[in-house]
Curated annotation (Swiss-Prot):
It holds the Pfam family Bac_DNA_binding. One of its GO terms (molecular function) is structural constituent of chromatin. This protein is one of the two subunits of integration host factor, a specific DNA-binding protein that functions in genetic recombination as well as in transcriptional and translational control. GO terms for cellular component: cytosol. Belongs to the bacterial histone-like protein family. It comes from Pseudoalteromonas atlantica (strain T6c / ATCC BAA-1087). The keyword Cell membrane does not apply. Heterodimer of an alpha and a beta chain. PROSITE patterns: HISTONE_LIKE. This is Integration host factor subunit alpha. The keyword Transcription regulation applies.
């Protein structure tokens, strides 16, 4: 099971008493800020949660799995996430639910 943006908005509505539209707008605005920062090359640091970083991957050789043909994999930027110590500790000390 995964937590969706709609579920986040619903939790804000329930926990903070926000109206549903404002909660949805808040979630969308938060993710838009993160997206814009990453697109412009900035690191995103969320205290107590973790960091979103950009990493440059250089071009490298690859292979088409169907044909076995050698193909180059283009250089690109990728987003990485490194959880903060507080998040790591909380996740490590929580029993998984099924």
């Amino acid at each position: 099971m995964a937590l969706t943006k709609a579920e986040m908005a619903e939790h804000l509505f329930e926990k903070l008493g926000m109206n549903k539209r404002d909660a949805k707008d808040l979630v969308e605005a938060f993710f838009e800020e993160v997206r814009e920062a990453l697109e412009s090359g900035e690191q995103v640091k969320l205290s107590g949660f973790g960091n979103f970083d950009l990493r440059q991957k250089s071009e490298r050789p690859g292979r088409n799995p169907k044909t076995g043909e050698d193909i180059p994999i283009k250089a690109r930027r990728v987003v990485t996430f490194r959880p903060g110590q507080k998040l790591k500790s909380r996740v490590e000390n929580t029993k998984p639910t099924e």
